[in-house]
């Protein structure tokens, strides 16, 4: 067994929880949303039929059920959280007559197999690993040439609104040793915020545990960082949100170049500021400006890991927030209003000052698909 720290597995296993459970009142609608997601990242979900699938971290299994409904040839799951493994077992029983199913109850870093797969799917597990790039490289190793890897990215910019909410939890002492009571306090405090979150599909208390209380000992990883890590192993196919437009003719000889990911990286970085707020979208801007924005926002994320909040940390946060305000494009009016309100609240502790902030959510987690080369 690996001696490395496993951020998700340690926290979930310690408390015996699965805070990723999705509330799915309408299965048909949920499956349609999943189909549209796959199409957005360049994959018709019908292509799963007859394929060999590896899923890492299936969690409570709602998304797994969608995959299995597409009739793959085989499905292999790697799940290291005992509570999740128990939940996924019950789901897999309903499909074992039509699909070859294999469940490995281990940490992914301890998983070994000579098999290669048509699809490797790792949703919500790459960001916050101790070394996300290393995790990606192990994932791509299980993809056969021409096969697809589907994963997520979260960077400092997309995470900023939630990093600030994590900081509020610590400043206001909403977290203590009682996990359930802490989650209820946080869910109550941010209830109005969550009511503004499009597509919210899990319990507010589960969100509180997974996003606010979870210590997040690992690192963020952006789309650009992930594509750089995979440069020699995989080629970008698609993403959600979609940001890359390629006007080349299909016979253009540049398609034969080895650095196919570089134009995508440049495009992403020039538009990265749009991840900060799901209510606003503006034109491309300087890569230098966005690198600075991501650097400062990532520092805010690091502050959100601190357990005990004090005046010195608040002063540092104020410096970061003012730098972000200065960095924002003039079109980012709603983001500016929200961040100004947050900064005012730090000074006044008057809940009314958070009014504009409560509507602010970033494009937190992005989906990415790449082709193994």
Identify the role of each PLM range.
Residues 81:
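Conserved SAM/SAH-binding beta-strand->alpha-helix loop
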Residues 150-186:
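Conserved class I S-adenosyl-L-methionine
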Residues 178-307:
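Substrate-binding/catalytic lobe of Class I Rossmann-like enzymes that use SAM or dcSAM, i.e.
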Residues 28-49:
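Conserved alpha-helix/loop element of class I SAM-dependent methyltransferases that forms part
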Residues 60-71:
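Conserved SAM-binding loop of SAM-dependent methyltransferases across substrates and taxa
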Residues 119-131:
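A short SAM/SAH-binding and catalytic strip from SAM-dependent methyltransferases
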């Amino acid at each position: 067994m690996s001696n490395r720290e496993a951020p998700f597995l340690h926290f979930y296993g310690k408390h015996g929880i699965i805070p990723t459970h999705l509330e799915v009142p309408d299965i048909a609608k949920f499956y349609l949303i999943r189909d549209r997601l796959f199409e957005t990242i360049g994959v018709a979900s019908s292509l799963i039929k007859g394929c060999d699938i590896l899923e890492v971290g299936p969690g409570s299994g709602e998304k797994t059920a969608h995959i299995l409904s597409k009739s793959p040839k085989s499905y292999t799951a790697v799940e290291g959280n005992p509570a999740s493994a128990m939940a996924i077992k019950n789901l897999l029983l309903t499909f074992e007559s039509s699909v070859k199913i294999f469940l490995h109850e281990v940490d992914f870093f301890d998983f070994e197999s000579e098999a290669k797969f048509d699809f490797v799917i790792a949703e919500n597990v790459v960001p916050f690993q101790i070394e996300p790039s290393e995790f990606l490289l192990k994932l791509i190793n299980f993809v056969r040439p021409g096969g697809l890897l589907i994963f997520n990215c979260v960077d400092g910019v997309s995470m900023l609104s939630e990093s600030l909410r994590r900081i509020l939890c610590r400043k206001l002492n909403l977290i203590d040793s009682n996990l359930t009571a802490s989650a209820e306090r946080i869910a109550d405090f941010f209830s109005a915020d969550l009511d503004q979150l499009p597509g919210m599909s899990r319990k507010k208390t589960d969100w509180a545990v997974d996003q606010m209380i979870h210590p997040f000992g690992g690192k963020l990883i952006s789309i650009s960082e992930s594509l750089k890590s995979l440069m020699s192993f995989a080629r970008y196919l698609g993403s959600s949100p979609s940001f890359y437009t390629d006007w080349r003719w299909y016979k253009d000889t540049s398609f034969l170049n080895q650095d196919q990911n570089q134009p995508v990286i440049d495009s992403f970085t020039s538009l990265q500021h749009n991840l900060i707020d799901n209510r606003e979208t503006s034109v491309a801007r300087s890569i230098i400006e966005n690198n600075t924005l991501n650097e400062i926002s990532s520092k805010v994320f690091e502050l959100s890991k601190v357990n005990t909040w004090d005046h010195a940390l608040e002063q540092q946060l104020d410096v970061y927030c003012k730098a972000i305000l200065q960095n924002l494009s003039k079109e980012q009016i709603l983001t500016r209003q929200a961040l100004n309100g947050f900064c005012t609240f730090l000074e006044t502790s008057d809940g009314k000052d958070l009014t504009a902030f409560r509507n602010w959510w970033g494009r937190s987690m992005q989906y990415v698909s790449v082709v193994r080369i």
